[in-house]
Amino acid sequence: MTKTITPSSQGLDQKWYVIDATDQRLGRLACEVAKILRGKNKPTYTPHMDTGDFVIIINADKVAVTGRKSTQKLYRRHSGRPGGMKIETFEKLQQRIPERIIEKAVKGMLPKNALGRQLFTKLKVYPGPNHPHQAQKPEELTLNTIPNGDK
């Protein structure tokens, strides 16, 4: 007889967290957010279920990258038509649509299946300090994605 407890979707309490991305490192922030979305920070984590929490990221326009990535990192998209490839640097995309940078980084760290698409809908990213989710009473989560030697 097994004593393994499998959580059901009724017994899950999904919290809302708000994270300030000001001066946070992009990849390290995305990694932590992906863990929270999947529910890996909970003892009830189950790989095939959505046991994660909702995450609101504010100040997405102030996220940081190290080195020369701001000018060298490229974001590609394609319209699907011949010659429809568009390439943008991190710097230009941050000026135009800053929330897309964090969304692409987090989406790349989620599973590439139906569960990953469902988890991605629980991520809300906003370029400024305001968000429309006050009714959910999100609790502030402080992440330190800046290594000690890198100020």
From Swiss-Prot:
One of its GO terms (molecular function) is structural constituent of ribosome. It comes from the Bacteria. Keywords: Ribonucleoprotein, Ribosomal protein. One of its GO terms (biological process) is translation. Residues 126-151 are annotated as: Disordered. Pfam families: Ribosomal_L13. NCBIfam families: rplM_bact. Part of the 50S ribosomal subunit. The keyword Ribosomal protein applies. This is Large ribosomal subunit protein uL13. The gene is rplM. Belongs to the universal ribosomal protein uL13 family. InterPro entries: Ribosomal_uL13 (IPR005822), Ribosomal_uL13_bac-type (IPR005823), Ribosomal_uL13_CS (IPR023563), Ribosomal_uL13_sf (IPR036899). One of its GO terms (cellular component) is cytosolic large ribosomal subunit. Gene3D superfamilies: Ribosomal protein L13. It comes from Crocosphaera subtropica (strain ATCC 51142 / BH68) (Cyanothece sp. (strain ATCC 51142)). This protein is one of the early assembly proteins of the 50S ribosomal subunit, although it is not seen to bind rRNA by itself. It is important during the early stages of 50S assembly. Residues 142-151 have a biased composition (Polar residues).
